[in-house]
């Protein structure tokens, strides 16, 4: 210092010391300010601190700040996440009093019955969403966007589809392109003999349910109109110069036979095979890893089978799906799944969804629901044929919607009874107060959706077998429930077509509207003369719908049926998926009927999905 003083005059030395002191004071104040407003990282994004609070925080004593920082970051790491966030700074004059708002736990007494824990922020009280969700029947979840959490709340869980206006009998059926009937857990499998779903909804034994079969057909019909054409890989046509097919790679073990032969009935060559059941069978390498809809033309001369080997996601294990010439529904043993496809002693086409067949087999159970499974096929490895018979046109494709549609249409033609209906061969108990429906009952919803399916099959093929079947299907509409029909009369005035023809009548809304859509499809397709009866039934039904629609409006949602009126019990409120079905149906009807009531109800019922309610007095 003496050396420095000797070399620098006192005025310069004083300036240097003053600058040094000023820098020290500024740095000291900055450190104090930073610590005073320090908050846990996971809470800092939620704090809103205004300029006055920041200023108060900067003036907090350093000892107190150090104590708080040390306590929050070191002493209680678990509590740090649970503690309510503190909003605002500290007031030095108030003995450490927190400025602004803070969360604090508060008891919440619910309806004078029980207490739950909530949180209070000033005058605002927050209840746990786990309680809110159940109490108000609402929905919410935490989702991530760009690394940040966000809570999304919704009043309902079901969506309304945009109506393709106007509706036509040869077009997409409502929003059925989004239906996947075969993957439902109440579908036991797709029958190998019939090619349609077998339901277990009301009985684990399985039964054919006309509504489900019609929906299966209508969904695939609609998908065919809305999806791009499928990719098809041809593996065998038995033609030597077929440029579209893959190179033939058949393996014929000793004792087996395979050859291309002419089939005069088909005017083409086919593959003849002879392979004893005890042999490995003749096999064709496939190796497809993209598509899983297999199709082949088949004719057996003896008992036999066609099997498909699949490499799966289950540790790359091989599973084999066997299509056997018997009537067994489905069986599963170890890694082998069996579907009976019937004798097949005349030429027929077998089309199977290997994904569905694999998963239904692995998930097979003795209960009403198929067991959930994650297994999926990764590769279609090879096809194996045993017995004596013929094969042709072996393909694998992305989809085969029209095959599924015509399987449903053909089933409806084959299984319609002499009264024009499709009897449902399972007992149905709708609820307390209603008599059980014994096996053999008809459903107006089944009749309507079957008609919609058959009309489309007729419009595609111009085959009158489909139109005639649809025309006969109007007969149950004319008979009362107690006469083994589907008609009910509300207040001795309004004709109604019952989804469930119960005693007393139930007046289910969605099933009634489906029955009307079927009648509309038929009257528009059959013409003035043939469609006369369908037109009369449709017009009477539409009059009833317009008169009775207000009975299904609760002011905040819709009602499934009128059991509260018929039985004098609590109303049967429609779940949100049924509520949106009501809206989708009314949207469709609004494109074929100009009555303003349909658009008015659509608008109001849509608003209920967002929490709107009718005005009170």
Swiss-Prot record:
**Which loops or segments lie on the Lumenal side of the membrane, by the record?**
29-617
Per the record, what ranges lie on the membrane's Cytoplasmic side?
1-11
Tell me the membrane topology, using the record's own terms. Single-pass type II membrane protein
GO biological process terms, semicolon-separated: heparan sulfate proteoglycan biosynthetic process; heparin proteoglycan biosynthetic process
Provide the binding site for Ca(2+): 237, 239, 268-269, 392
Which chain positions carry the site (Critical for catalysis)? 179, 186, 560, 578
Reaction catalysed by this enzyme = [heparosan-N-sulfate](n) = [heparan-N-sulfate](n)
Instruction: Report the transmembrane regions from the record.
Output: 12-28
Top enzyme class: isomerase
Task: Please verify whether the record's keywords include Iron-sulfur.
Answer: no
> What InterPro entries does this protein map onto?
C5-epim_C, C5-epimerase
Q: Which UniProt keywords apply?
A: Calcium, Golgi apparatus, Isomerase, Membrane, Metal-binding, Signal-anchor, Transmembrane, Transmembrane helix
Q: Which PANTHER family match?
A: D-GLUCURONYL C5-EPIMERASE (PTHR13174:SF3)
What the record says about family reads:
Belongs to the D-glucuronyl C5-epimerase family.
Q: What is this protein called?
A: D-glucuronyl C5-epimerase
Q: What is the lineage of its organism?
A: Eukaryota, Metazoa, Chordata, Craniata, Vertebrata
State the encoding gene: GLCE
């Amino acid at each position: 210092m003496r050396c420095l003083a000797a070399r620098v005059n006192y005025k310069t030395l004083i300036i240097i010391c003053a600058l040094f002191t000023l820098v020290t004071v500024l740095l000291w104040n900055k450190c104090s300010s930073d610590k005073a407003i320090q908050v846990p990282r996971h809470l800092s994004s939620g704090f809103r601190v205004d300029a006055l609070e920041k200023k108060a925080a900067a003036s907090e004593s350093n000892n107190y700040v150090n104590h708080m920082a040390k306590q929050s970051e070191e002493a209680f790491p678990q509590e740090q996440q649970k503690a309510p966030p503190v909003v605002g700074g500290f007031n030095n004059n108030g003995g450490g009093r927190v400025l602004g708002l803070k969360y604090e736990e508060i008891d919440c007494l619910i309806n004078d019955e029980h207490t739950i824990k909530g949180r209070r922020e000033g005058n605002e009280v927050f209840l746990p969403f786990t309680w809110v969700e159940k109490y108000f029947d609402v929905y919410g979840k935490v989702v991530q966007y760009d690394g940040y959490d966000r809570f999304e709340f919704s009043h309902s869980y079901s969506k309304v589809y945009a109506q393709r206006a106007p509706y036509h009998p040869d077009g997409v059926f409502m929003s059925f392109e989004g239906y996947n009937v075969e993957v439902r857990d109440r579908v036991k499998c797709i029958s190998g003999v019939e090619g349609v779903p077998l339901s277990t909804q009301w009985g684990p034994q399985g039964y054919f349910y006309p509504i489900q079969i019609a929906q299966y057909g209508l969904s695939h019909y609609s998908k065919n109109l809305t999806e791009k054409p499928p990719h098809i890989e041809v593996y065998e046509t038995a033609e030597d110069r077929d440029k579209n097919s893959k190179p033939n790679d058949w393996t014929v073990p000793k004792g087996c036979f395979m050859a291309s032969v002419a089939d005069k009935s088909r005017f083409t060559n086919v593959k003849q095979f002879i392979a004893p059941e005890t042999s490995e069978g003749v096999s064709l390498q496939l190796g497809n890893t993209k598509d899983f809809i297999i199709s082949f033309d088949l004719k057996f001369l003896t008992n036999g089978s066609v099997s498909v080997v699949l490499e799966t996601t289950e540790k790359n294990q091989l599973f084999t799906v066997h299509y056997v010439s018997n009537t067994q529904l489905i069986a599963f043993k170890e890694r082998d799944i069996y579907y009976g496809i019937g004798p097949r002693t005349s030429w027929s086409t077998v089309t199977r969804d290997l994904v569905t067949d694999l998963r239904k087999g692995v998930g097979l159970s003795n209960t009403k629901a198929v067991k959930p499974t994650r297994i999926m096929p990764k590769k279609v490895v090879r096809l194996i044929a045993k017995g004596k018979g013929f094969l042709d046109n072996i393909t694998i494709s992305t989809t085969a919607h029209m095959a599924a549609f015509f399987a449903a249409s053909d089933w409806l033609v084959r299984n319609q009874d002499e009264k024009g209906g499709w009897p449902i061969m399972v007992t149905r108990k709708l609820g307390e107060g209603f008599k059980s429906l014994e096996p053999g009952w008809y459903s107006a919803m089944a009749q309507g959706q079957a008609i919609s399916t058959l009309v489309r099959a007729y419009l595609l093929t111009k085959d009158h077998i489909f139109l005639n079947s649809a025309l006969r299907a109007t007969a149950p509409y004319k008979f009362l429930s107690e006469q083994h029909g589907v008609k009910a009369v509300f207040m001795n005035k309004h004709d109604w077509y019952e989804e469930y023809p119960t005693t007393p009548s139930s007046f289910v809304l969605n099933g009634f509207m489906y029955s009307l859509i079927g009648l509309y499809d038929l009257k528009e397709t059959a013409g003035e003369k043939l469609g006369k009866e369908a037109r009369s039934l449709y017009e009477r039904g539409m009059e009833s719908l317009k008169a009775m629609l207000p009975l299904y409006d609760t002011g905040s949602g819709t009602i499934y049926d009128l059991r509260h009126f018929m039985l004098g019990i609590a109303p049967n409120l429609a779940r949100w998926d049924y509520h949106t079905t009501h809206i989708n149906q009314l949207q469709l009807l609004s494109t074929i009927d100009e009555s303003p009531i349909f658009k008015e109800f659509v608008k109001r019922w849509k608003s209920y999905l967002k929490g709107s309610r009718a005005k009170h007095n």
